[in-house]
Amino acid sequence: MRKYINYLLVLCLVSSCTLDTEAEPEVLETSTTTSSTTTSSTTTTVQNIDEEIVVDEFGIELLDVSPEMKQQFDELIAFVEKRTGLTYSEYPKFNLYTLEGYRDYSAASYLDDFEKDYEEGEWERAVLSENMWGLTNASPEKMKELIVEFQRCASAGSYNLLDQILRVPIKRNQTKLNLWEQSVIVHELVHSLQGQIIDLSEWYTTMKDSDDFMNYPGRRSIMEAQADLVQAYWESNLDSYDRQRMASERPNFRCSVSLPEYFYIPFDLYYDFGARLGKQIHSNGRMEALNEALYKLPTAEQVYSPEKYFSEEPYINVEIKNLELENFTVIDQGQIDSLDLVYLLQTKIGQKDAVNAAIGLGGGSWVDYVNESNDLFMTVKISGDDVNELNEISDAFQNWADFQTRFTKSLSNSSWKGILYEGDTNFWIYNDGNFLRLALSNDIEFMLSFLSDCSNEQCNTSF
């Protein structure tokens, strides 16, 4: 279940959505970001092809930095330091591309990581999981193509957590950065400063090595909130004429294909709900409070619901049993956070109901099983903050299933408890008042056998 969802979270690091809205003059209302934070594991190797062209590690042309641009960078760095109250430990590293070159870099770095991140058959299982959850009908090949396009079109700039390089597309043959480019660079310079203060490279490496990204969404949201705020401060210095000029300088970032809506769900957390939380933190303690928040690791639930951030509501660890199943073995397991619930539910029941359910999450765990045919069997166990919140989460998943024509609903019988939704994917749901349990399988005979097996001291469904 989670491997692919996690990968989309990492994907969001690679390239964040570029939205069309302009920053509001009131700096307390944080502007919409136009850039992203990246995590490609490659390091930049600048090579001299000849005396006129310099390229990066993928052979993509890097543009020269004029003395005027260097002076602009110095001024923007000073601005970021003044607004954050923090100081760079070293001069930020940056690469400048043409727009097409930047898109080529985004795609190439993703494909380079793809080959390193996925073992044989793992990508196919990941996409099968997305199919079973009803997020997409795409094949593994088509999904890969969509994500490559997503990389190409969804970002106006990036900061790489690992090699700590800021990358921004600019116009060729100009001696000075235009206003749009400077605004994007301000945002990315904040990320560069955050990376130096916190050592984001080490933090990300630890998450990747353990394959546990539970702490990522919350910190990412705080990082984007601060970067958006500083960017809004910079844009607030522009008069109405310069704002219009900056808007006219914005490149066309539209995607050439229609991308699935759920691709953007993590960005709603980082740039919308995160901005709201960041605004409250800033209102309570100004920039010093945001600086302190960078060291915290809020849950996604705390970002969706700021009052839970300030009350420091804890995440509850939920134990789930690894079952002994004929012909199936455990392939992966992990924990669930509120972003996962919204990610699974939103496209079927809407954002409002999905988020309302997610902010009642106590905790959750999942286990994926696979057989020799690479068929998946997935189990999920969820707790709520209280019985009412658990019931709301249960109702949300039942509505999720009821709204899908691919399912036929079957009530429980004498052999098993809960509700079974039958179809090409079979979905079982049971709420015992303490935990919500879910199971998914593409084999109805296996599912019925699983639900009816109480030959041991406990039924299978007591996982």
Task: Cite the ranges covered by each PLM segment.
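Pan-zinc metallopeptidase signature
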Residues: C255-N374, M378-K381
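Short Gly/Thr-rich strand-loop-strand
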Residues: K352-A357, E389-F435
